[in-house]
């Protein structure tokens, strides 16, 4: 009998969202969004679920619903930096698997969370694991808001980009720049899913790594790890994840799903 990989789930929750202020505390069926996310992480089998925030109101909401919470600095440039502070404070062993569950994804699949944690444990040469799924729509390939990842033969990340990678020259070139006329990609193209599992060792070193030029150009923080020689294992899944909550329209859509009459 195999046992699930032990892991810790940390949910970074920043209150000062530009597009949707107070997002972690938005009501979803009588509970704050961040609590709904924590429930998903607990359902995934995390041995500990921690909500990390710079806002006391978020910590109070977490504790009111039975979740551990930790106060972090307000000046973190990314969720990974916030996780790094938590990892340093908690003193986890180097190989502890820590999953960063985004605080604005109340519909995240618990199975995917668990599988990404297990994927990291199965790849001891990698510091990070994440996930991706195949893209079949050319419009998504050319959408800069859809982050793509190119993989090697072992499904380890070669590069992440907002650009179409790999570029299917023979399929795309005759139609460029008419994106609407583009056929489906000739080679597999994968959409990155923003779910990460880290080794605690890497999290503790992350703040000391200089920002990478490619990270700044693409505005993708995972490129910092690649730039500094770390390996990222990518779990390929056929199931596209549920959309997160970034805008008021997203919030209204998700709130409708949590209404009692939506069952």
UniProtKB/Swiss-Prot annotation:
Taxonomy of the source species: Bacteria, Pseudomonadati, Pseudomonadota, Betaproteobacteria, Burkholderiales
PANTHER family reported for this sequence: 3-DEOXY-MANNO-OCTULOSONATE CYTIDYLYLTRANSFERASE, 3-DEOXY-MANNO-OCTULOSONATE CYTIDYLYLTRANSFERASE, MITOCHONDRIAL
Catalytic activities: 3-deoxy-alpha-D-manno-oct-2-ulosonate + CTP = CMP-3-deoxy-beta-D-manno-octulosonate + diphosphate
Keyword NADP found: no
Protein name stated in the entry: 3-deoxy-manno-octulosonate cytidylyltransferase
NCBIfam families, per database record: kdsB (TIGR00466), PRK05450.1-5 (NF003952), PRK13368.1 (NF009905)
Organism: Burkholderia multivorans (strain ATCC 17616 / 249)
Function: Activates KDO (a required 8-carbon sugar) for incorporation into bacterial lipopolysaccharide in Gram-negative bacteria.
Pfam families cross-referenced by the UniProt entry: CTP_transf_3
Record keywords: Cytoplasm, Lipopolysaccharide biosynthesis, Nucleotidyltransferase, Transferase
Pathway: Nucleotide-sugar biosynthesis; CMP-3-deoxy-D-manno-octulosonate biosynthesis; CMP-3-deoxy-D-manno-octulosonate from 3-deoxy-D-manno-octulosonate and CTP: step 1/1; Bacterial outer membrane biogenesis; lipopolysaccharide biosynthesis
EC number per UniProt: 2.7.7.38
């Amino acid at each position: 009998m195999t046992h699930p990989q032990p892991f810790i789930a940390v949910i970074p929750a920043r209150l000062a969202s530009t597009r949707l202020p107070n997002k972690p505390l938005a009501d979803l069926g009588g509970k704050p969004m961040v609590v709904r996310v924590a429930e998903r992480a607990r359902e995934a089998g995390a041995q500990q679920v921690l909500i990390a925030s710079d806002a006391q109101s978020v910590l109070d909401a977490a504790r009111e619903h039975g979740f551990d919470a930790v106060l972090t600095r307000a000046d973190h440039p990314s969720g990974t930096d916030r996780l790094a502070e938590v990892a340093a404070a908690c003193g986890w062993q180097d190989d502890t698997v820590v999953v960063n569950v985004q605080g604005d994804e109340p519909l995240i699949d618990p199975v995917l969370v668990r599988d990404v944690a297990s994927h990291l444990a199965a790849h001891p040469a990698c510091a990070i694991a994440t996930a991706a799924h195949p893209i079949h729509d050319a419009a998504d390939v050319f959408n800069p808001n859809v982050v793509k990842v190119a993989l090697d033969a072992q499904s380890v990340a070669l590069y992440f980009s907002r650009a179409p990678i790999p570029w299917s020259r023979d399929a795309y070139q005759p139609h460029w720049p008419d994106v609407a006329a583009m056929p489906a990609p000739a080679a597999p193209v994968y959409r990155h899913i923003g779910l990460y599992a880290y080794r605690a060792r890497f999290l503790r070193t992350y703040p000391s790594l200089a920002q990478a030029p490619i990270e700044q150009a693409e505005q993708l923080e995972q490129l910092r790890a690649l730039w500094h020689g770390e390996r990222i294992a990518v779990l390929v899944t056929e199931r596209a994840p549920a959309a997160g909550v970034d805008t008021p329209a997203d919030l209204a859509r998700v709130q409708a799903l949590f209404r009692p009459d939506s069952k």
